Amino acid sequence: RWYYHCDKLGIIVWQDMVNGGGAYPMWYVTYLTNALQPLMRRAPDGKLLWGFLGRGSVHSREEYARELADTVAALGRHPCIGCWVPFNEGWGQFDARKATETLRALDPSRPVDEASGWFDRGGGDVHSIHNYFYPLRIRPNVRTVVLSEYGGIAWPMPGHEPPRKTYGYGTARSRAELTERYCDLQRKTVLPQLKKGLSALVYTQLTDVEDEVNGLFTYDRTAIKPDAAAVRAVNEALEVEFEKAVKE
């Protein structure tokens, strides 16, 4: 039903495959990979790395192949599906090029974001960047360059906090500070990169969730956290600049 509503509303879905495999050592998959990028992300794509990413067993890799095919069969008829994403941030990632080849054989009509985040192998149609901590530098690429995760500024709005921990990528102390930091991020970090080939943005994130309070809306979906007019204005400025970049 969710995909049906996306079809009706015109919401484009970038569809991840279900995470799987064994346990992920977070010290490697998340912390070390972030701290030592891009060095760690250039690790050879072989069985040693697959083991660190939870895909050490043949059975697990075969199960992924079945689930990938089943996912395309189940969802491929929905017009809302705009892009397939075999792997996100290394979770259960292995042989990414082969996954892309399989997806293109199953559905040649849609682009593939081969590895959203960490372990980019140069394949697929999208160079997919997750960046929360480092200067953003977009370089020319034969693939579409997408900032597919960024931002994540936390602010637990009083009276609307989720029931669990309140995680984010940096914390604001008030609505005013959240608004200021969001607008500065868009104007000073993102906007200058549009002329360099940055083609799409995915802000983290639309709403607060159980473990994170970095949404633009509260966990209960009843309030917008930053100043709506300021957010709209800076987003419209990005849109204008993007249109200029396309025409150039």
Over which residues does each language-model region extend?
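Substrate-binding/catalytic cleft of secreted carbohydrate-active enzymes
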Residues: 1-222, 226-229, 235, 241-244
